């Protein structure tokens, strides 16, 4: 057994690459290319105040509760109770549901560029009805495949991650180097300011979406026990992974800015246009349809993998009595069919915003902002909960601990993550000046109503719980404060029984006692 255990241990660089693969996506590069050289500042800033804190805090929490299920529900619930734990995992599930239309919009645009006519491709990519049709067809196809429980989906996803993300990212950077080295004129002003113009407040708004680029790093915390000497090596893996991620994002963004003028940058199309322009420059336009297929394949493979994934967490919690039996139904393959169908209905309704918003780009941006807002609420709970547990569960074993002694480093790391998340949360409500989002009323209505409804829903569901919702076959470990209450109650019962026995023995020794004598007082 020792050899088996040892054989599955991850190396520092292996874990770092796993973290990079989980986070890096090229679809967000055009949003930051709008900022030119200062985009590097945003990437570095978000990495310091969000990416690294998320990775380290999640690692400590995951290691603390490695033998207990629930994920973020467990982490937040241990600190603030079941109600807020349910809110956290509900937000995580809904956020992923809203994410699907945005990532599939990018996939639809990629598919539109398979043709050889730039004019036709760009017109098709901008067509709202085309994007709506592609999003719905691909999503429901992915849902159908997930319900079938096909094992080959995982293999497709692994290939898709390499073909649709890593290879295109490297190719984009190589093309930029070739372009500049051969005398190509850069459209990005590298003499500009590294630090953005903070006096222009709405310039920060679009950049707040960069936090979503790094979202999901908390998932890497589950591997904290799979690495040798986690206290020393896990932080190394985090910092190496963060450095590689930032380098890919910065150089990828620069590569787009070099070939596309800032005024022509489009959030959904510019990545494909950038590749098109580079391929024309090196006289290899025939590669454009191939890279479009590769990018689309990467998107579709990711959706196939994750369409059922995030719903598994809410499904497990639901079986513990937090969701009605309707949501606990599975099919013959053991897949949570009703949750997937409800998820699909939500994706369909959200996708209909294509018809309301003035453009595909504005639809993409408003859903991205709503996704950021919901995810950030969960992160605010996670960061503050981690600090709170340092005092509420002082003696709990921490196989991986931020700081060897005291709580100062946790306050620094967790506090940095909390403040960064709070700043991004506030900025995300403001419409970006760089994108025509149509009516500001629609913008604020979608974001505010969306947040209120999604946050209120789990509290309403929690208040409506019934004993019949609990699946008798499920085994969900109690929270530490529930165990303490049970232990205290048991101790009180044992103490009471001991006192009662002692009293009876004393009474018997003294002789018969009147039947009217009251029983010993029970202390709580």
Language-model features: locations:
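TM-loop-TM module centered on a large, flexible mid-protein loop between adjacent transmembrane helices
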Residues: 74-75, 81, 113-122, 237-307, ...
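Transmembrane helix-boundary motif of multi-pass solute transporters/channels
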Residues: 2-109, 211-212, 217-220, 227, ...
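Membrane-interface "cap" regions at the ends of multi-pass membrane proteins
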Residues: 1-59, 65-69, 190-191, 404, ...
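C-terminal membrane-solvent junction of multi-pass transporters and transport-like membrane proteins
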Residues: 6, 130, 156-159, 329-333, ...
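Membrane-interface loop-to-helix entry segments
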Residues: 130-182, 215, 238-243, 368, ...
């Amino acid at each position: 057994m020792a050899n088996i255990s040892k054989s599955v241990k991850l190396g520092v660089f292996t874990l770092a690459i796993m973290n990079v693969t989980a986070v890096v996506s090229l679809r967000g590069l055009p949003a930051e290319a709008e900022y030119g050289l200062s985009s590097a500042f945003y990437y570095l800033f978000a990495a310091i105040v969000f990416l690294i804190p998320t990775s380290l805090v999640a690692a400590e929490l995951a290691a603390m509760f490695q033998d207990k299920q629930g994920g973020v529900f467990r982490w937040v619930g241990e600190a603030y109770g079941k109600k807020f734990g349910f809110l956290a995992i509900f937000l995580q599930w809904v956020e992923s549901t809203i994410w699907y239309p945005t990532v599939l919009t990018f996939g639809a645009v990629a598919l539109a560029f398979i043709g050889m006519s730039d004019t036709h491709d760009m017109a098709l990519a901008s067509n709202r009805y085309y994007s709506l049709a592609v999003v719905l067809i691909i999503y429901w196809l992915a849902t159908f495949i997930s319900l079938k429980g096909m094992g080959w989906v995982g293999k497709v996803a692994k290939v898709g991650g390499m073909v649709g993300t890593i290879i295109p990212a490297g190719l984009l950077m190589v093309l930029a180097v070739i372009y500049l080295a051969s005398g190509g004129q850069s459209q990005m002003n590298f003499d500009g300011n590294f630090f953005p113009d903070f006096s222009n407040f709405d310039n920060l708004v679009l950049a707040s979406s960069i936090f979503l680029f790094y979202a999901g790093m908390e998932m890497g915390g589950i591997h904290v026990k799979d690495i040798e000497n986690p206290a020393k090596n896990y932080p190394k893996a985090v910092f190496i992974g963060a450095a590689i991620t930032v380098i890919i994002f910065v150089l990828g963004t620069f590569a787009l800015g070099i070939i596309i003028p800032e005024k022509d940058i489009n959030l959904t199309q510019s990545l494909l246009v950038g590749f098109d322009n580079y391929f024309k420059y090196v006289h290899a336009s025939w590669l454009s349809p191939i890279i479009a297929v590769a990018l689309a394949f990467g998107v579709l493979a990711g959706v196939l993998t994750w369409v059922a994934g995030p719903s598994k967490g809410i499904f497990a919690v639901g079986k513990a009595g937090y969701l009605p039996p309707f949501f606990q139904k599975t099919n013959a393959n053991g897949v949570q069919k009703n949750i997937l169908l409800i998820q699909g209905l939500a994706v369909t309704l959200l996708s209909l915003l294509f018809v309301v918003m003035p453009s595909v780009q504005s639809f993409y941006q408003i859903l991205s902002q709503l996704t950021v807002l919901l995810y950030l609420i969960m992160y605010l709970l996670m960061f503050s909960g981690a600090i709170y547990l340092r005092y509420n569960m002082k003696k709990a074993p921490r196989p991986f601990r931020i700081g060897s002694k005291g709580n100062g480093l946790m306050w620094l790391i967790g506090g940095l993550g909390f403040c960064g998340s709070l700043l991004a949360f506030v900025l995300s409500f403001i419409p970006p000046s760089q994108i025509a989002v149509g009516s500001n009323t629609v913008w604020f209505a979608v974001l505010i109503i969306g947040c209120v409804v999604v946050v209120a829903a789990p509290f309403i569901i929690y208040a409506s719980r019934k004993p019949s919702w609990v699946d008798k076959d499920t085994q969900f470990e109690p929270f530490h404060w529930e165990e303490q209450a049970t232990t205290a109650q048991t101790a009180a019962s044992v103490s009471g029984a001991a006192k009662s026995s002692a009293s009876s023995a004393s009474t018997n020794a003294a002789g018969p006692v009147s039947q009217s004598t009251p029983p010993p007082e029970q202390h709580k």
